[in-house]
């Protein structure tokens, strides 16, 4: 997984007040990853952040995936990863408790993927499609190196000004 020391990636963060742990949202999320193929199609997934995620990601894992997606845990994170052609990591935080305010989708794409404007457009289209599925209330796309040179992108959840869309 990417560490705080790595700066060579673009991050996408989508936050929503919509509860994501519903079956139809999990199915739409799964279908979106399959539809985009290429770099956005994970090779592996898991419910814990491990050096090597244990479960393969393909059409046959849908029942197991939906079972984990809808499991009534107070707070869970699902992790997805792909190593080639460029590293990418995705995660979904699903909170189901009284004080829950936001559920979150995050993506970290290594900068080596962005060789032309075609990859940038693909990222924007993927982000738009994911925001429609998650019902994103706000989100951001930022290059980690630039964010560190300036200041962190802050969000409305932190009640501070930042670069975001609503």
Model-inferred region functions:
Residues 1, 63-67, 127:
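Intrinsically disordered, low-complexity boundary segments flanking structured domains
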Residues 6-14, 95-115:
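Glycine-rich, often proline-containing surface loops adjacent to acidic residues and nearby aromatics
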């Amino acid at each position: 997984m990417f560490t705080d020391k790595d700066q060579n990636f673009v991050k996408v963060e989508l936050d929503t007040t919509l509860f994501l742990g519903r079956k139809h949202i999990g199915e739409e999320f799964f279908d979106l990853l399959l539809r985009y193929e290429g770099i956005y199609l994970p090779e592996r997934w898991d419910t814990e952040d491990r050096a090597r995620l244990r479960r393969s990601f393909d059409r046959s894992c849908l029942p197991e995936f939906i079972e984990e997606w809808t499991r009534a845990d107070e707070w869970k994170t699902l992790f997805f990863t792909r190593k080639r052609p460029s590293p990418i990591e995705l995660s979904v935080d699903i909170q189901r408790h009284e004080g829950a305010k936001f559920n979150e989708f995050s993506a970290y794409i290594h900068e080596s993927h962005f060789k032309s404007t075609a990859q940038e457009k693909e990222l924007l289209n993927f982000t738009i499609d994911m925001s429609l599925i998650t019902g994103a209330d706000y989100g951001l796309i930022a290059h980690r190196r630039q964010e560190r040179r300036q200041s962190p992108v802050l969000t409305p959840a932190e009640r501070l000004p930042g670069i975001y869309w609503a």
